[in-house]
């Protein structure tokens, strides 16, 4: 049965086509701020239990869509699935975040790295993509909203792989980058091949857009960013399938703290660049000059403010971008676990309401 996408506003915005309103989705929209997510996680037994069981991953992916009229779903997974598939032993200790049992620190460690067999080691992710697509689609083949697949960037994955987990200063991975750039580039080369294969597998399974999260690119100095992060994002994009089932599959790249390098990110071959809240969206639109769409960029902590303040800040973001195609509203980073869900409802409503007013000429 041929499928019909009932709401393709998000995909059209990524391709800089005119839309009736500005689409919105939120990084970490399926997460701990939702009571129903916490209930499902308790049933699954752990975070990895959620991520590695397609039925649970599907359930939590759809939860925010049941609450809010969001314009896209994003696969529930984790950016560290690739290094886990490489055999580094991922674990999430309570209250401590991700940890790897076998960090990559030595020449021997690097020599053991290989691109994982995606089907054999990450089939649970592609199974989840297929199951989510089915769950988004009714009996007549009508799909509610598009599904986004994603991966961490080669550099961001390397940060966790070398540090063995999160870090305040990334001194271990940055020391390797400067002292042994040959080792760093070998890690990044394997990671880039793996990320491209992983995203292509998600596209083949049904992801209708993909996003590369370069969460720690902004930890690098200018110059080092280009060598160790941007160049490898470019390599991933060059290997991506950009069409599937006769439709364009847009790609988004997001470097947290990457506003300085906006023009360079826009020249990588992406369809859209994600922005954090430190960037003026109107000036960013002028800087990219219509070459790419922009995604962002409300400060997530604004969602702790009173509803009218949330609405005012949402209007400010929309007004900054103006009545132009090519904007997807999002936060500048992931939503906090402490965010009141009712405040998210206020945000989504205001983005839809005010962007329609802007299109009609009634907004500022």
Curated annotation (Swiss-Prot):
Keywords tagged on the record: Cytoplasm, Decarboxylase, Lyase, Porphyrin biosynthesis
Gene3D superfamilies linked: 3.20.20.210
InterPro entries according to UniProt: UROD/MetE-like_sf, Uroporphyrinogen_deCO2ase_HemE, Uroporphyrinogen_deCOase
Subcellular locations according to the entry: Cytoplasm
Pfam families: URO-D (PF01208)
Biological process, per Gene Ontology: protoporphyrinogen IX biosynthetic process from glutamate
EC number: 4.1.1.37
Site (Transition state stabilizer): 78
Annotated positions binding substrate: 28-32, 78, 160, 215, 333
Keyword Cytoplasm part of the UniProt annotation: yes
Cytoplasm among keywords: yes
One Gene Ontology term, aspect cellular component: cytosol
Top-level EC class as recorded in UniProt: lyase
PANTHER family: METHYLTETRAHYDROFOLATE:HOMOCYSTEINE METHYLTRANSFERASE RELATED, UROPORPHYRINOGEN DECARBOXYLASE
Role this protein plays: Catalyzes the decarboxylation of four acetate groups of uroporphyrinogen-III to yield coproporphyrinogen-III.
HAMAP family: URO_D (MF_00218)
Self-association state and partner proteins as the record states: Homodimer.
Name listed for the protein in its UniProt record: Uroporphyrinogen decarboxylase
């Amino acid at each position: 049965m041929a499928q019909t996408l009932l709401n393709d506003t998000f995909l059209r915005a990524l391709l800089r086509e005119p839309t009736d309103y500005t689409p919105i989705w939120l990084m970490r929209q399926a997460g701990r701020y939702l009571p129903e997510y916490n209930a499902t996680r308790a049933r699954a037994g752990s975070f990895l239990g959620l991520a590695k069981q397609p039925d649970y991953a599907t359930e939590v992916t759809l939860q925010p869509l049941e609450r809010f009229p969001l314009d896209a779903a994003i696969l529930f997974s984790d950016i560290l699935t690739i290094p886990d598939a490489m055999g580094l032993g991922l674990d999430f200790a309570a209250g401590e975040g991700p940890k790897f049992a076998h960090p990559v620190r030595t020449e021997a460690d690097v020599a053991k790295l290989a691109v994982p067999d995606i089907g054999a080691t990450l089939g649970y992710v592609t199974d989840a993509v297929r199951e989510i697509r089915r769950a988004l689609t009714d009996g007549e083949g009508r799909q509610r909203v598009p599904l986004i697949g994603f991966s961490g960037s080669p550099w961001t994955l390397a940060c966790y792989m070398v540090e063995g987990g999160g870090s305040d200063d990334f001194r271990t991975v940055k020391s390797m980058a400067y002292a042994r750039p040959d080792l760093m580039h070998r890690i990044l080369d394997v990671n880039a091949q793996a990320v491209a294969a992983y995203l292509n597998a998600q596209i083949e399974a049904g992801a209708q857009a993909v996003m590369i999260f370069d969460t720690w690119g902004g930890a690098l100095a200018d110059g080092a960013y280009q060598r160790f992060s941007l160049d490898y994002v470019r390599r991933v994009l060059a290997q991506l399938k950009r069409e599937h089932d006769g439709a364009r599959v847009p790609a988004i790249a997001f470097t947290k703290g990457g506003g300085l390098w906006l023009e360079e990110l826009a020249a990588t071959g992406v369809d859209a660049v994600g922005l954090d809240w430190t960037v003026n969206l109107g000036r960013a639109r002028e800087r990219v000059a219509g070459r790419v769409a922009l995604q962002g960029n409300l400060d997530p902590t604004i969602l702790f403010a009173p509803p009218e303040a949330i609405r005012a800040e949402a209007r400010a973001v929309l007004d900054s971008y103006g009545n132009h195609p090519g904007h997807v509203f999002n936060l500048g980073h992931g939503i906090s676990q402490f965010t009141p869900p009712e405040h998210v409802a206020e945000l989504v409503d205001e983005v839809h309401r005010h962007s329609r007013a802007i299109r009609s000429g009634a907004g500022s």
